[in-house]
């Protein structure tokens, strides 16, 4: 789905998880708890490929000026490998600009916010505990399972 289609698609799921976070669900009986057990639920890791992760979490594409979901390094500084100098993203900053994007009165205003910050609204931000910076996994299938990360380190950076 496109960026505009993803939020209405996940909104009912987020509604359910808000209720499960605040009220939970009560099981009348379980094998270990004959008197019943209450359970609260949360969505924590967002595990998907990089394109879906960016859409779901409200980050800009990996082609954007702000290409990283963990820092505010600009594409023009992409050759900077000194990670101590990378300005870290924060939840407060992300939520603030995502909320501004959501409340914008026009598509032009939304585009300006998105272009300037690399952030847009995600329905997942309605979850009171959800932190897109900490909970978005770094494309585990391609990075780890298919060993793209290892190949990148060995072939691109020349580290063995």
Where are these regions (language model features)?
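Active-site neighborhood segments
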Residues: 1-22
